């Protein structure tokens, strides 16, 4: 099964704040037909950040939104040209965002499964280095899909 779609991987974005990234993700939730309510998605992304940071280690963040407006569980990836302050666990800036979108109806199951799979992958240096060195959306999607299938 292909979880990561090439059209949902965005390369070399020039955002300077976490809010710009979250607005982009909310906008894309409409463009990519993930949700029917951009503002609800934005609010859920921000509410989750207020609970505790989704900024992990080594420049990665895993923001996520659970909302009734989200049709199917989905993943959107954004690789930034520079670092953005995300209040990450290691205190470093974030330049690689893996956003999860989960329908309310799947909040307990799909949400936790996606989150744990992605978090586990980011603990492997070969994965994080591969993602950072990838030159195209295709390479990122291929690497993540391969690793997700292995787990």
Residue ranges: model-predicted function:
Residues 1-151:
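Cytosolic covalent-transfer regions centered on His/Cys nucleophiles
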């Amino acid at each position: 099964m292909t979880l990561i779609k090439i059209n949902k991987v965005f390369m070399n974005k020039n955002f300077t704040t976490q809010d710009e990234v979250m607005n982009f993700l909310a906008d894309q939730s409409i463009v990519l037909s993930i949700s029917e309510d951009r503002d609800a998605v934005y609010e859920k992304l921000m509410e989750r950040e207020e609970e505790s940071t989704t900024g992990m280690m080594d420049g990665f963040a895993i923001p996520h939104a659970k909302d009734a407006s989200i049709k199917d569980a989905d993943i959107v990836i954004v690789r930034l040209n520079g670092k953005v302050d995300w209040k990450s666990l290691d205190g470093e800036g974030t330049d690689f965002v893996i956003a999860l979108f989960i329908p309310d109806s799947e909040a307990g199951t799909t949400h936790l499964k996606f989150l744990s799979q992605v978090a586990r992958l980011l603990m492997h240096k070969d994965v994080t280095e591969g993602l950072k060195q990838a030159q195209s959306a295709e390479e990122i999607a291929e690497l993540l899909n391969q690793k997700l299938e292995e787990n």
